[in-house]
């Protein structure tokens, strides 16, 4: 089951609801062992949630985690002391607004309050009309997992959320969900970072998988491959 509250993101309130649902299901259905939760890293990052803490809460509550969708949200940091640069950053961020998918946005304002918008154009308009109010935007746009920056230094990814997720898995040998790379937005990336053809997209997907492998390897989460023994060596 993939939690889908408004905007398809799991806040602490929805996390409690998910835990309550699984407790009810486990108590009432003898087939509950076939049901598990699907956890989307991008969604948690957009909500300013700590993925490791969320996963720890689920594990401690006995909620089975069947799948983790590895996805990289976009983070935009707006320079409040440079209005002209802020305009430039918003202009480039606007190139990620497209009609195929909704790109929900969460922002933390200068007072620490959270503001949300259903799609990127509304967030851009709010930031343009209230310069300096929102120093950081988090955008539900699945960028390649290995991307630390896109086009401008102010436009980055939420790799810290992915690191929190991998660190959780490294700490708990009893949690081994399916890991699914969920970057579905290659074809709608802005032209400067969009794959030029199918082969380029295949290379991007390959590089994502290699990046994930390296993160797992660093945390000793990959089983060593058995050494091949060729018949002519026997």
Question: Whereabouts are the PLM-identified features?
Answer:
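Eukaryotic N-terminal low-complexity, Ser/Thr- and Lys/Arg-rich leader segments
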Residues: 227-234
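Generic marker of "main functional regions" within proteins
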Residues: 49, 75-80, 106, 111, ...
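Residue-level marker of intrinsically disordered, low-complexity segments enriched
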Residues: 87-90, 150, 227
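Flexible, acidic glycine-rich loops studded with aromatic residues
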Residues: 64, 115-224
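Acidic/histidine-rich catalytic cores of soluble enzymes
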Residues: 1-128, 134, 143
């Amino acid at each position: 089951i993939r939690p889908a509250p408004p905007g398809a993101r799991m806040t602490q309130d929805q996390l409690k609801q998910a835990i309550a649902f699984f407790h009810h299901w486990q108590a009432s259905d003898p087939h509950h062992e076939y049901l598990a939760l699907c956890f989307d890293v991008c969604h948690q990052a957009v909500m300013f949630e700590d993925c490791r803490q969320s996963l720890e809460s689920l594990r401690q509550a006995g909620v089975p985690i069947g799948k983790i969708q590895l996805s990289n949200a976009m983070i935009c940091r707006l320079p409040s002391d440079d209005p002209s640069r802020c305009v430039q950053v918003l202009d480039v961020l606007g190139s990620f607004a497209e009609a195929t998918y909704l790109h929900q946005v969460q922002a933390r304002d200068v007072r620490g309050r959270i503001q949300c918008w259903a799609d990127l154009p509304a967030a851009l308009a709010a930031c343009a009309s209230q310069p300096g109010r929102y120093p950081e935007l988090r955008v539900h746009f699945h960028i390649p997992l290995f991307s630390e920056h896109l086009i401008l230094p102010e436009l980055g990814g939420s790799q810290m959320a992915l690191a929190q997720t991998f660190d959780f898995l490294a700490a708990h040998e009893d949690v081994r969900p399916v890991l699914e790379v969920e970057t579905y937005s290659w074809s709608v990336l802005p032209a400067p970072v969009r794959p030029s053809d199918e082969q380029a997209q295949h290379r991007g997907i390959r590089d994502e998988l290699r990046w994930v492998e390296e993160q797992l390897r660093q945390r000793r989460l990959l089983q060593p491959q058995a050494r091949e023994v060729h018949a002519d060596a026997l």
